[in-house]
A protein has these predicted regions:
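N-terminal Rossmann NAD(P)H-binding glycine-rich loop of SDR-like oxidoreductase domains
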Residues: 2-22
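Rossmann-fold cofactor-recognition segment
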Residues: 41-53
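NAD(P)H-binding glycine-rich loop region in Rossmannoid oxidoreductase-like domains
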Residues: 51-87
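NAD(P)-cofactor binding segment of oxidoreductase domains
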Residues: 63, 79-108
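Conserved Rossmann-fold NAD(P)-dependent oxidoreductase catalytic core, especially the SDR/UDP-sugar
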Residues: 94-138
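Active-site helix of classical SDR
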Residues: 138, 142-145
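NAD(P)-dependent short-chain dehydrogenase/reductase
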Residues: 148-202, 207-211
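C-terminal substrate-binding subdomain of Rossmann-fold SDR/epimerase-dehydratase oxidoreductases
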Residues: 195-292
């Protein structure tokens, strides 16, 4: 059985769905969000868990034979950065403790494309040295720390770490008003968000594709690396989305960096299934009967 923490969030739920499609049993943890999406209803085991509770976390191993862990649970920063770091670091350490205690095969953990911030190269590849630079958000700062904490914590344990440098993900279950990605606002609105231009864009991946990539990295017979970029592998522009929707955007804009996924494809065979048109059609159909 594979454990997905934060398994009812957008990325976690699509990861669980993809693992089910590969024939695996899945247990997901839920804390703040407890609504089970229709595509998981009755198909996964749901455990209510505050990942900062070490005893409760380790007790999962007494109820389930867990073979692998995908750690995606995380909190949203408030006014106190130390409180945010304490919460998410405690959850990470408890997940790592569980991985070592249970002797799981593989431990996959969420990092971010934001760790590359400051590199001028396009696209971003895993072999680039991560720069020392001011970071735009507390979440990215924590994700940058997650990487060495995970690999060093699991060194010599027999548990294989898999660091997931996750790109810009959108799709079913995304926050419709996400401050990190204007795509949902563009697709959901009759008029485009202000200050959005045809040439604006960068990295993007549709959530079902992202979940499938994580599932493949979690279950692949062998992996040649411990760090993988996770996205569609191609840049996008908001002009592409606007064209699909018949919306006009003003010209201009800046196309931001995107992730190279050659390593992911080489080790798992992953290729995205959704282009811009297919993702918009799938998302709009989903939103007909779902609030997010």
């Amino acid at each position: 059985m594979i454990l997905v923490t934060g398994g009812l969030g957008m990325i976690g739920a699509h990861t669980a769905r993809a693992l089910l499609a590969l024939g695996h049993d899945v247990v997901v943890t839920a804390h703040r969000r407890v609504e089970v999406p229709a595509f998981l209803e009755g198909r996964v085991t749901v455990e209510t868990l505050d990942v900062t509770d070490r005893a409760a976390f380790l007790a999962l191993g007494e109820r389930h034979a867990i073979s692998d862990i995908v750690h995606l649970a995380g909190s949203i920063p408030g006014d106190d950065p130390v409180d945010f770091f304490r919460t998410d670091l405690t959850g990470l350490v408890n997940a790592l403790d569980a991985a070592r205690t249970w002797g799981v095969r593989r431990f996959a953990v969420a990092s971010s494309l934001g760790v590359y911030a400051g590199r001028p190269e396009i696209p971003w590849t895993e072999d680039l040295s991560l720069p020392t630079t001011a970071l735009p958000h507390l979440i990215i700062a924590f994700k940058k720390a997650v990487e060495p904490l995970t690999t060093h914590s699991l060194a010599g344990s027999g548990v294989q770490p898999v660091v997931l440098r996750i790109g810009t993900i959108w799709g079913p279950l995304v926050d419709p008003a996400s401050p990190f990605c204007p795509i949902p606002s563009l697709v959901n609105s009759a008029s485009p968000p202000p200050d959005l231009h045809t040439g604006d864009g960068g990295d993007v991946c549709y959530a079902p594709d992202a979940g499938r990539a994580i599932a493949l990295l979690t279950t692949a017979p062998t992996l040649q690396h411990d760090t993988y970029n996770l996205s569609s592998g191609r840049p996008f522009t908001y002009g592409e989305f606007a064209a699909v929707m018949g919306i006009d955007l003003p010209p201009g804009g800046v196309n931001s960096p995107h992730l190279d996924i050659s390593r992911l494809t080489a080790d798992t065979g992953f290729k995205p299934q959704f282009d811009v048109a297919a993702s918009v059609a799938d998302y709009k159909k989903w939103r007909e009967t779902n609030p997010r």
